[in-house]
Amino acid sequence: MDTLTAIGRWLAKQHVVTWCVHHEGELWCANAFYLFDAQNVALYLLTDDKTRHAQMSGACAPVAGTVNGQPKTVARIRGVQFKGEIRRLEGQESDAARKAYLRRFPVARVLPAPVWEIRLDEIKFTDNTLGFGKKLHWLRDSRAQQA
């Protein structure tokens, strides 16, 4: 199994992302339920335009964040650190992403918030189930690497 496939399988089983944005010297983090898109290597989420993080992001912004589980033992720790770009989707892109998102999270039908995409450009996946401190690295526009 290649690195991106391994990372993608794990991301598809999780559902909460933490992401951070920077604007005019200020940092802010937020959490949301997400849907992983393996084809585009992206996360889709809903967040209102009035939130602090959306205001700081504008239509598009650099982003960094994490996805992690909550294991009870160190040997089972798995998690992703990433950097990429967050952007607010519009039109058909938004409609298609919302439809897929609502299949996974039907309760979100009551939320009128816009759909955002976090395009993952760099991923570091720590997976202690493969050995303590095992890291898998992936870069967009580059071959997967292992460290």
UniProtKB/Swiss-Prot annotation:
InterPro entries: Split_barrel_FMN-bd, UPF0306
Source taxon at top rank: Bacteria
Protein family according to the UniProt entry: Belongs to the UPF0306 family.
Record's protein name: UPF0306 protein YhbP
Species: Salmonella typhimurium (strain LT2 / SGSC1412 / ATCC 700720)
Name of the encoding gene: yhbP
